[in-house]
Amino acid sequence: MRQRTLKSAIGCTGVGLHSGAKVTMVLHPAEAGTGIRFRRVDIAGGGAIVPALWSSVGDTRMNTCLKNEAGVVVGTVEHLMSALAGMQIDNCLIEINGPEVPVMDGSAAPFLFLIECAGVVEQEAPRQAIKILKRVAIKDGERTASLTPSSGFSVRFEIDFGASAISRQEFFVNLTRGTFKAEVSRARTFGFEQEVAMLRAHGLARGGSLDNAVVIDSTGTKVLNDDGLRYQDEFVRHKVLDAVGDLYLAGAPLLGHYHGVRAGHAVTNQLLRALFADATAWELTTIAPGSAAAPFAAQPLAIAANG
């Protein structure tokens, strides 16, 4: 298999979920081996490049925020990264004029649409993957996440909320481009009505609304969105969407199975750090042409290993 990039540039404008600021973003084709990178065009100088890597993850409160050595940040990258994974985009330069990726409708679907409109082209460089060789796990109270060996890439996620509108949900999916688009990409981020004021007081969710999030009422029994849910278990499917995006920061596509229980951005990033801290837990492999087990693509491991 070969690496892939966009056929042409394409952009969008929206608001940041947490900042509430209007932001314009343009996705550009990129050369093979350059990976996924963000460029803050509102900041002059070379420090404006922010690599999309696990080692660049800083703040994980309610989102995944990347930060480079110069202190330049790009927040809420997980939905876009999930879409890039779902479309198997290896190399892309993302120009953005603010500190946060636009939330769009709260899912990965708008970003998938942008990529489909731009088109995708194969490049000469072969695609490589990180093959999980043994179980790696992280536990933080009731939150756990693990990676185990597998011939493909699959995700199982479990959540359990006191709110009866959510309650306990579990979802498993073998991830290919088709299953991601149909079963995961449209699941929106979600929150609780009574938490909005607290989040905004801490500088979060300032751009959140019923147009870009599923909101559960203060009793925990009802979804406030007039259009209801896109999937019966949309909440857990969105957690899968987040996990796919966060795992795409690994530095190469994964050949393994991810299992998350109440896990969030912080736990998944801790899991990647634990994986790369153990050289016996993984190996780099070239994905054979026509491989049925080919996982989502990401950027070459050499970049991640130096992080």
From Swiss-Prot:
<keyword id="KW-0378">Hydrolase</keyword>
<dbReference type="GO" id="GO:0016020">
    <property type="term" value="C:membrane"/>
</dbReference>
<dbReference type="GO" id="GO:0103117">
    <property type="term" value="F:UDP-3-O-acyl-N-acetylglucosamine deacetylase activity"/>
</dbReference>
<keyword id="KW-0862">Zinc</keyword>
<feature type="binding site">
    <location>
        <position position="242"/>
    </location>
    <ligand>
        <name>Zn(2+)</name>
    </ligand>
</feature>
<feature type="binding site">
    <location>
        <position position="79"/>
    </location>
    <ligand>
        <name>Zn(2+)</name>
    </ligand>
</feature>
<dbReference type="GO" id="GO:0046872">
    <property type="term" value="F:metal ion binding"/>
</dbReference>
<comment type="pathway">
    <text>Glycolipid biosynthesis; lipid IV(A) biosynthesis; lipid IV(A) from (3R)-3-hydroxytetradecanoyl-[acyl-carrier-protein] and UDP-N-acetyl-alpha-D-glucosamine: step 2/6.</text>
</comment>
<keyword id="KW-0441">Lipid A biosynthesis</keyword>
<comment type="similarity">
    <text>Belongs to the LpxC family.</text>
</comment>
<dbReference type="Pfam" id="PF03331">
    <property type="entry name" value="LpxC"/>
</dbReference>
<protein>
    <recommendedName>
        <fullName>UDP-3-O-acyl-N-acetylglucosamine deacetylase</fullName>
        <ecNumber>3.5.1.108</ecNumber>
    </recommendedName>
</protein>
<keyword id="KW-0443">Lipid metabolism</keyword>
<dbReference type="InterPro" id="IPR020568">
    <property type="entry name" value="Ribosomal_Su5_D2-typ_SF"/>
</dbReference>
<keyword id="KW-0479">Metal-binding</keyword>
<feature type="active site" description="Proton donor">
    <location>
        <position position="265"/>
    </location>
</feature>
<dbReference type="InterPro" id="IPR011334">
    <property type="entry name" value="UDP-acyl_GlcNac_deAcase_C"/>
</dbReference>
<comment type="function">
    <text>Catalyzes the hydrolysis of UDP-3-O-myristoyl-N-acetylglucosamine to form UDP-3-O-myristoylglucosamine and acetate, the committed step in lipid A biosynthesis.</text>
</comment>
<dbReference type="InterPro" id="IPR004463">
    <property type="entry name" value="UDP-acyl_GlcNac_deAcase"/>
</dbReference>
<keyword id="KW-0444">Lipid biosynthesis</keyword>
<dbReference type="InterPro" id="IPR015870">
    <property type="entry name" value="UDP-acyl_N-AcGlcN_deAcase_N"/>
</dbReference>
<feature type="binding site">
    <location>
        <position position="238"/>
    </location>
    <ligand>
        <name>Zn(2+)</name>
    </ligand>
</feature>
<dbReference type="GO" id="GO:0009245">
    <property type="term" value="P:lipid A biosynthetic process"/>
</dbReference>
